[in-house]
Amino acid sequence: MSNIRDIAKEAGVSVTTVSRVINHHPYVTEEKRNKVMQAMKTLNYIPNHLAVNLSRGKSRIIAVVFPWITNPYYLRILEGAIKQASSHHYHIIVIETHYNEDEEIKALEMLKHRSIDGIIFITKQLSIETICDYEEYGPIVLMEKNDHLPYIFINQYEAMKKALNHLMSEDYKKIGYTVHRNNGFSANERTKAYATLPEDMQYKQFIYVSGLSLTEGKQLAQRILKQMNLPDALIVTNDAHCAGLYAEFQNQGIKVPEDIALISYENGELSQVNNITIIDLPLLQMGERSVELILSDSATSEELPSKLIIRKST
């Protein structure tokens, strides 16, 4: 029995396009719609009865899924998504998951039952294979590069290389970095970049698994200062975490950058106030483009650039 992937292959289009045709989505070119309809006829495909019935109406709601609503990094992406959705007369709902797979499944079930028209995963715990099981019910966008679903992607490997190259150019030798999840996509890419350093500059003891908040940054600083051997530079996951490190180092008499240099990812208000060197990530644009991917059949997956901005912390 044919399925939605077979139709996509036969028609030479994406699974998302097939889903949009089945669900009478307006943002599909006539050429692609005809290809899909012909493929369905050739393969004798009968669309899922539930999906067809529910597609007669649109909720005009897009869900944005991420772990913590208090994190400025995610909120900046959300801001871009809300702005773009509003311009198309769509609404955004937030689904906070705390990296709980059951909560992510609930969001996908909302798509299946047509409570929402699409899902944007800023980050996720579920496997891509599990998420793909739901793509026939509507568009799903990820923020990591993959071979199965549309994505908006920042090359974390290249971003990390920019930070490392800058620190090496400033003659820092003992470079460390922080990650939130060892198995996360961004963490894996940064680890690959770190592994390109000369072997005598790689320090496993300077790779810190920590949180994302300002408070957790302070706690990490306290952990670091208990070590006998200290890094002379740190690349930090986000601005809030970096602000916590910076504040606690200052409290303990550790000078930035004289004793420890800091680089952060993001470029929000906290890094600007503290004059932190940053890898500027186009978070607002990520949110905007992810909504475009949900709504427009002509939009394609995209890699967005990062930029090094040097300030006084290195």
Where are these regions (language model features)?
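Hinge/beta->alpha junction and helix N-cap segments in small-molecule ligand-binding domains
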Residues: 67-76, 94-102, 152-162, 177-222, ...
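Flexible loop/turn connectors
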Residues: 226-233, 237-314
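N-terminal helix-turn-helix DNA-binding module of bacterial transcription factors
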Residues: 1-60
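Flexible loop/hinge segments that line or gate small-molecule binding clefts
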Residues: 121-161, 240, 266-276
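Periplasmic-binding protein-like
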Residues: 108, 116-122, 176-179, 207-208, ...
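N-terminal helix-turn-helix/winged-helix DNA-binding helices
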Residues: 2, 41-79, 88, 98, ...
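Central regulatory/effector-binding core of bacterial HTH transcription factors
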Residues: 83-128
